[in-house]
Regions:
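Cysteine-nucleophile active-site neighborhood
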Residues: 297-371
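Structural motif
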Residues: 10, 89-91, 119, 151, ...
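Phosphate-binding active sites in nucleotide-utilizing proteins
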Residues: 244-308, 312-319
């Protein structure tokens, strides 16, 4: 497509568990099979769904989050990544209007910010004509939300779909088709360390869903209903840089891969970015800043413990006063050891006088505001591990708040020029070196 207008849509639902991710993966693959270059986005801070998106579309997927990002930045990122696309699919998070406070930061607000319509995915199990009231409510709850169509999921039969189609028509929402009820179309658990091999094995899922979409969904009508002008790329403010020309090393492999592409873009503005793999026992490259992102170190404890060259080079760099920003799994890697679910300890870098453990796993999650050195940074927390309290350990710095400005129990540890904590930061609009000033 070379037109100034391209199909652009938000895939949203009434709640989590409705099948948004599964449908999105199938739609991305169906459009790719038509020869379209389709750009995907994900509402919210999630790292995992974008990996599924890339598997389905063949293109990197980008997060859009109105808690961590300014509206101007959201629009700029969206526009920049859609310039070479023939179609755009944005997957929502939770329910359409669910935000961190009321609907602030919701999928609906993101769609409004970038100016695209919404296609609802409705779980139709045990539903019939009464679904029309639900659709009418979603369409009219907010006048600035454009709900143009609906796809029904988990539909029992053509006769079942007839009731649903009539309900949608009477609610003023275009019925675009349905996905039949089947147990085969399930995305794996949210807490999985997906290797490249496992991702490739998952490739059958988008293929299967794409086949169902082509058979039961009017894709042409969907694309036509969502045709909108391609956004012009605004003039973006330059990423703040305190001293350009620096060297930044980023750990990136199967153990450490929770990375926002826009953060890498911000780091590139600071200087030269190089990547290395602790899992492959690669030594830390020469750098002025080491970025250890989150990921799944708990799935590779034996390999990381055996990677002595990588561990010792990081420990030596930190001991010499090198700057380190470590998030979640990256922080765990800096600890003396990580204990698995059975309590077995595996030696790690020993930069922090702490132990991380997977024992008694309990999910901790939420948005975070980090206030440090007179500045505010934003991010989110999502982890099952915990830090074993130590009598003597690192100092804790800064203050962390929830999205509702309540004090969060999340800690940021500091030792020399090492900053480590559970919060995954989004710093694409800020100078990451300012964290150390």
């Amino acid at each position: 497509m070379t037109s100034t207008s391209i199909p652009q849509l938000l895939v949203a639902a009434g709640s989590s568990g409705s099948g948004k991710t599964t449908f999105t993966l199938g739609l991305l693959r169906a459009l790719k099979r038509r020869g379209l270059a389709v750009q995907s986005f994900k509402c919210g801070p999630d790292y995992i769904d974008p990996k599924f998106h890339q598997l389905s579309s063949g293109r990197p997927s980008i997060n859009l989050d109105l808690f961590m990002m300014s509206p101007e930045h959201v629009r700029a990122v969206y526009a920049r990544h859609t310039q070479e696309a023939d179609a755009v699919v944005l997957e929502g998070v939770m329910g359409l209007y669910d935000g961190y406070v009321r609907m602030h930061g919701s999928s609906a607000e993101v769609a409004k910010t970038v100016g695209i319509p919404t296609v609802l995915l409705v779980d139709a199990r045990s539903s019939a004509y009464s679904v029309g009231a639900l659709l009418y409510g979603f369409k009219h709850f907010r006048q600035d939300t454009e709900v143009v169509g609906v796809v029904f999921n988990r539909v029992a039969s053509e006769n079942h779909y007839r009731f649903l189609r009539e309900a949608a028509e009477d609610a003023g929402v275009i019925p675009l088709g349905y996905i039949p009820k089947t147990k085969l179309l399930e995305v794996p658990s949210r807490h999985l360390g997906l290797s490249l091999r496992e991702l490739q094995e998952l490739d059958a899922l988008p293929e299967d869903v794409a086949a169902l979409i082509e058979k039961h969904v009017d894709v042409d009508r969907l694309l036509e209903a969502c045709m909108r002008p391609r956004p012009a790329v605004p003039i973006e403010e330059a990423v703040p840089t305190s001293a350009p020309g620096r060297k930044i090393a980023v750990a990136r492999d199967e153990a450490f891969n929770f990375i926002y592409e826009e953060n890498i873009r911000a780091l590139t503005a600071q200087g030269e970015v190089s990547f290395f793999s602790p899992l492959k026992d690669e030594a830390l490259p020469e750098c002025d800043l080491l970025y250890l992102p989150g990921g799944y170190p708990e799935f590779y404890l034996s390999e990381l413990a055996a990677a002595e060259r990588s561990r010792s080079s990081i420990a030596a760099y930190a001991a010499a006063g090198g700057r380190v920003l470590a998030e979640c799994g990256g922080m765990m890697y800096l600890c003396r050891a990580i204990r698995d679910e059975e309590g077995k300890a595996y030696p790690m870098c020993g930069v922090l006088d702490q132990e991380a453990t997977m024992e008694g796993m309990r999910l901790r999650l939420g948005y975070r505001k980090l206030r440090l050195g007179g500045r505010e940074y934003r991010g989110h927390e999502f982890h099952y591990s915990s830090i074993v309290p130590q009598e003597v350990g690192e100092e804790t710095v800064g203050e962390q708040l929830t999205a509702r400005d309540e004090v969060a129990p999340t800690l940021l540890y500091r030792r020399g020029n090492v900053l480590a904590g559970y919060t995954h930061l989004y710093f694409a609009e800020q100078d990451p070196f300012a964290l150390f000033s």
